[in-house]
Amino acid sequence: LFIDDVYNDKKIFKDNVIPRELVFNSPYYLKECDGFSPKHKAWSNISGIDLIRNIKGDFLVLEDNLRVPSGISYMLENRMVMRDVFPELFTRYKVSDIHQYPNKLYNCMLECIPKKTKDPHMCVLTPGRANSAYFEHRFLSEQMGIALVEGKDLFVEKDIVYMKTVRGKLKVDCIYRRLDDTFLDPKAFFKGSLIGVPGLF
């Protein structure tokens, strides 16, 4: 609600809850999003919340990452190895199961696509092999059974996103993007971006 209000009605400023300058001077405020509202006003479908436990045993939030959270693939891989090596710990301590994460992510992406869409196509958009989280991008795309693409693999034609394939262009219905906002679309944001998709925003 906060982000949608900031980019649309701006009631939080009109009601003097917080000063405009606090938001508008932030390096993360994107003036290009002014007047924009995503489907269901869901500005963040996925968030990475880092928790720590203090000496009293309380859980505290160390960091919120709403832009491009990463690390889930390492946690999933680590959990698989730990379950194989120390199965008794999982039984004794009733460790929560997390292996359904790729399925839940897949379903989250499906929810972003209109129900009437037949045979929807989805993909994971990666900055490329040089990115530190490339392993995760590849891991998630494989686990979900969807394409892993780079910006050069996509193009926009008449406001529709297409993927280049050996059989020609393929309409893309949902993208799980793993690159920062500013690099997403060189027409809308950082003009020098070589990893984004012109016209995607």
Where would I find each of the regions flagged by the language model?
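Domain-scale recognition of functional cores that engage charged ligands
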Residues: 1-201
